[in-house]
Amino acid sequence: MGMAGYSFVHFDLETTLKTLKTLDMHYLCIKDFHLPLDSNEEQIAAFHQKLADYGVKGYAVGPIYMKSKAEVDRAFAYARRVGVSLLVGVPNYELLDYVEEAVKQYDIRLAIHLHGPDMPLYPDATDIWNHVKDRDERMGMCLDIGHNLRYGSDSLADYIRYHKRVFDMHLKDVTAPTKAGQRAEVGRGIIDFPRFIKLLRKYHYTGAVSLEHEKDMKNPFMGIAESIGFFRGVCQATR
């Protein structure tokens, strides 16, 4: 399991890392409010040392939005400086040819993040698949199972269909398969987590499943702990 840095958008890095240590979590998807895109080598080294002090590794960066070629260049250069091999990103559709060249140049995998009904860009897994299926195999998706479901798409069925291009996952639960569905602590919504975990094992998923907690974001700690505990419990119970 990992943690999506966005879960701590209202908190500094120290608070984030203390929380991860308390939860015995060791993998973080790095957001740029914790490590700015213009960070230099010295700042990045200090950042990694701070993570190491808490037993945490930054396994990816993002999500990073890319609305121009310059922003594509900046995102991939940042990922290389940070030293990760996975960039969670949201490039505009018209930039995908340019993004593909960057993927080849940097040899960094791109996991396009979907946002369900909340924005028109990459609303679900099928949309991402249709845009990457004929491109470099290092272009795939960050499957956000909650956002995907709120768009009306079956996240578990989509994982089965597209698992070869699922490089990262954002874990959350929701209360309904519509835009009106609310974010919920994992286990309190409608997602079938025992089946989800069994599918991850069946298809030999090797990426991170990172909690992106988007409920009570100014006081998320109890919800984060509940979600992590539930998910771990289901993992144990389904072995």
Label every PLM stretch briefly:
Residues 35-36, 118-119, 148-149, 176-177:
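Short gly/pro/ser/thr-enriched loop/turn and capping motifs at secondary-structure boundaries
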Residues 14-17, 50, 54-141, 149-151, ...:
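Active-site acidic/histidine proton-transfer and metal-coordination neighborhood
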Residues 1, 5, 9-26, 125, ...:
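Histidine-acidic metal/acid-base catalytic patches
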Residues 37, 44, 72, 89, ...:
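Flexible, glycine- and charge-enriched loops at secondary-structure boundaries
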Residues 4-6, 31, 62-64, 90-93, ...:
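Active-site-proximal beta-strand/loop segments in catalytic clefts of secreted hydrolases
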Residues 1-86, 104, 164, 228-239:
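N-terminal pre-domain/capping segments
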